[in-house]
Amino acid sequence: VMFDAEHFFDGYKSNPKYSIEVIKTAFDAGAQWIVLCDTNGGTLPFELNNIFDDVKKVIPLTNLGVHFHNDTDNATYNSIESVRLGVKQVQGTFNGLGERCGNSNLVNVAANLILKLGYNCKLKKKLNKITSISRLIDEILNRQSLRNLPFVGSAAFAHKGGLHISAVEKDPKSYEHIDPSSVGNERLLVVSNQSGKSNVVNKLKKFKINIKGKEKKISSFLELVKNQESLGYAY
């Protein structure tokens, strides 16, 4: 049995004693999971520690779950912090789908727990499929995938500036916090009005175009690309 304590966090702030009594009663009656819900999405990360200190007096952390909404843009952070504090279950959705501002984004929660905090989650062996799953869900729902989504967005590992691209080619860690392939994503080197020769050379190599002896033409080609971008073209 899973008991979702709707509005728990707001209820606790209004009446701590009553809120604790409610979840204790459910647990004592046989509920295996007590899920604390931030239904209005207004709870902030710094509030969690004191609340869990009270809750764990009556419910073991191994039987606690959380369910955060994203109305203050803290759902993912709150979920990660809850796990760090000992909670064993996180409810959420892929791509943060949900009512109003959405729910905790399980893509970001899983990637951060596994890659940043070293948790041995069941998703660990399949984390490199998370980008394709994220995009498939958007395709099924006929939604435009957000380019700037952390980890799985098409722009998450995109580089435009010539200096950036030159540095990334020498040491990816200079401008990438993880290896894109660890989440099934890929590096994107963009040719734009911010580009240097490194961008163009990389793009030509990608298409297996031989540039030997043609280095002088790269500058004029780069200028052409920049002029075209000012007219609305993208490369």
Model-flagged regions — what are they?
Residues 1-64, 80-87:
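Alpha/beta enzyme core
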Residues 7-11, 40, 70-73, 96-99, ...:
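Acidic, glycine-rich active-site loops and adjacent beta-strand->loop/helix elements
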Residues 20, 73-76, 103:
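Glycine-rich phosphate-binding loop at the start of an alpha helix
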Residues 36-38, 85-102:
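Glycine-rich phosphate-binding active-site loops on the catalytic face of alpha/beta enzymes
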Residues 48, 101-108:
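Histidine/acidic-residue-rich catalytic or RNA/ligand-binding cores of hydrolases
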Residues 67-94:
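Small-aliphatic-rich amphipathic alpha-helix that forms the alpha element of a beta-alpha
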Residues 81-84, 111-115:
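Short glycine/serine- and small hydrophobic-enriched flexible loop segments
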Residues 111, 117-235:
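A mid-to-C-terminal "edge-of-domain" accessory segment
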